[in-house]
A protein has these predicted regions:
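A short beta-loop-alpha structural element at the N-terminal edge
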Residues: 14-28
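Conserved GNAT-fold acetyl-CoA-binding loop/helix
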Residues: 31-57
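A short helix-loop-beta-strand connector motif used in the catalytic cores of GNAT acetyltransferases and
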Residues: 52-68, 90, 171-173
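Conserved beta-strand in the GNAT
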Residues: 68, 75-83, 90-95
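A short, internal acetyl-CoA/4′-phosphopantetheine-binding micro-motif in the GNAT/acyltransferase core
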Residues: 94-101, 129-131
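Conserved acetyl-CoA-binding loop-helix of GNAT-fold acetyltransferases
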Residues: 96, 102-115, 142
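Conserved GNAT acetyl-CoA-binding A-motif
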Residues: 117-129
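Conserved beta-strand-loop-alpha-helix junction that forms the acyl-donor binding cleft
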Residues: 127-136, 153-158
Length: 182
């Protein structure tokens, strides 16, 4: 793997800042990635639900909190969306197209966020996810994230978890907040 200031490369995959022209291709990637949930009885509804709008992607792109993994044809195959919280850089969404999963692309995207967090002097990278889904909390734990005990969840992160339950339809006990110390 080679690293430059703005890009991470691994074989035929490059991680770069998302461009405006990429935005229309990203909902299809999220839809494809979400199909994995169709294999889980209790979460099948996620594979049938909506995805981030092009407008939402554009807002994250405008805030420079959005990176894509592109193939050798410069076509997006995965993305990661982040936003700054008072205490951390928060991963809002990570999606890799089904055809490109299990190739280390998610790991590369997360590494880009970890690098950006360090450069911008964040103490940590955080996210919210499912505790029991193999490609969620257990995956992030393999990448160095730890599940935060409820008593240690910062207010801004707790608000996100609460919103996921209230508006997102998630069951509170299935969700967790995770943190990677930069």
């Amino acid at each position: 793997m080679t690293t430059t200031q703005n890009k991470i490369k691994n074989n035929d995959i490059t991680i770069r800042q998302t461009q405006i022209d990429d935005a229309t291709k990203l909902p299809a990637i999220e839809q494809s990635a979400g199909q994995l949930f169709s294999t889980l009885e209790d979460l099948r509804w996620i594979s049938e639900s909506g995805v981030q709008s092009v407008e939402k992607h554009l807002a994250f792109i405008d805030q420079q909190g959005h990176w894509v993994a592109v193939n050798s044809d410069n076509e997006p195959v995965g993305f990661i969306m982040t936003t700054a919280l008072p205490e951390s850089l928060f991963i809002h969404e990570l999606s890799v197209s089904q055809d490109w999963q299990n190739r280390g692309i998610g790991k590369l995207l997360i590494q880009k966020v970890k690098d950006k967090a360090k450069v911008h002097k964040f103490d940590s990278v955080t996210l919210t996810t499912f505790r029991h889904v193999p490609w969620n909390a257990p995956y992030y734990q393999r990448l160095g994230f730890s599940i935060l005990p409820e008593s240690e969840i910062p207010h801004s992160l707790q608000e996100i978890l609460d919103d996921e339950v209230e508006r997102g339809g998630f069951v509170k006990e299935t969700r967790c907040a995770m943190k990677f110390e930069v």
